[in-house]
Amino acid sequence: MSYPQRSILAALTLFFLAPFVAEYLLGDFPVTFFWPYIVLAPLYGGGALLIRELARRSHRGWPTILLLGVAYAIIEEAFTTQSLFNPDIFSLHAHLLSHGWIPALGIGAWWTLFMLNVHPFWSIGVSIALAEGLFPSRARAPWLGNVGVSVAAVLFAIGIYYNTAYSLRHDPFRASTAQFIVSALLVVVFAAAAFLIPAPAPGRNPSPVPPALVTGVAAFFLGAAVFLSPILWNWGAVAWILAVDLVFLAALALFSQCSAWTPLHTLSIGAGGALLYGVHAFMQGPVVPCPKWIAFASHVLFLVLAIAVVAIAVLRTRSALLLGSQNQSGSQEQTPAQPLLP
């Protein structure tokens, strides 16, 4: 398969993987409720693909991806679903905004922070990490040309339109004009910050890093700490998530600057997050009515699929790293040693 063909396949993989991770692996929808994929793929897949391409085409890395993921989260939750402001989203009676309620802003601090974790780290981050792990030879290269990026942007816009239309049709709630304006400004701020921060330099720190298995397990349990945050603590739950985020981002910033950090470590973070989603699904019910046995069978099926994706990505990434080290060793053997002095 040629490079262009592999790139298109990689882009399509991310396009269809993102909605699977974001909604089905999480446990929101059972396998019998697969028709929303038609409108979820442009939203999640188009968004993840556009974010990845913008980051990779500008030779930037994960800080840019995560900041664009925050902008994505605000677009979806402030405009498409309005869940940041709606006290009874889709009539679920979950009282999501009552924890850390901020009257002046009309938001719940816990739910807002939770959404700013879910989308950047999972919907966008995990999806991209897994897709790049499946195509390791092209992990840091753009997958699309100008036309492809334009198509991704159009698909993302279509996804926003149809999902927003669905929300408006099924829920009479409307956020205030001020809330929409502030949200739009925040989208611009985070999108601009994504390209104003310095691009990460190659790791030169000679310090050792934990094995990839350890970083993956750590990502799993840190993700679990976010999802199991004690919401009845209200502002204490907000502080809980902030502390978890600080530990995760600080550790990631420290270890990813080490020369021993490999793409397998990056993949392990995504794998840990994906498996956490799959396990957590058993602790929550789907957001649509369905028999319990269908919900359980769906969780099992989606978790097995996630494990299969992770296993394939690990094998492919390991093979790519091994091939790269062999090629590097071969080139060093063929190159005659240069004298230190002329």
Stretch-by-stretch model annotation:
Residues 53-62, 135-144, 198-210, 256-264:
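Membrane-interface helix-boundary motifs at transmembrane edges
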Residues 60-66, 70, 75, 79-152:
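Membrane-interface helix-loop-helix junctions at boundaries between adjacent transmembrane segments
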Residues 24-34, 285-291:
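Short, hydrophobic transmembrane alpha-helix segments
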Residues 1-12, 209-213:
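N-terminal membrane topogenic signal
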Residues 40-53:
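Central hydrophobic cores of alpha-helical transmembrane segments in multi-pass inner-membrane proteins
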Residues 143-152, 172-183, 200-220:
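Membrane-water interface at loop-to-transmembrane-helix junctions
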Residues 17-24, 71-78, 153-163, 219-228, ...:
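Aromatic-anchored segments of alpha-helical transmembrane domains
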Residues 200-333, 337-342:
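Extended, charged low-complexity segments
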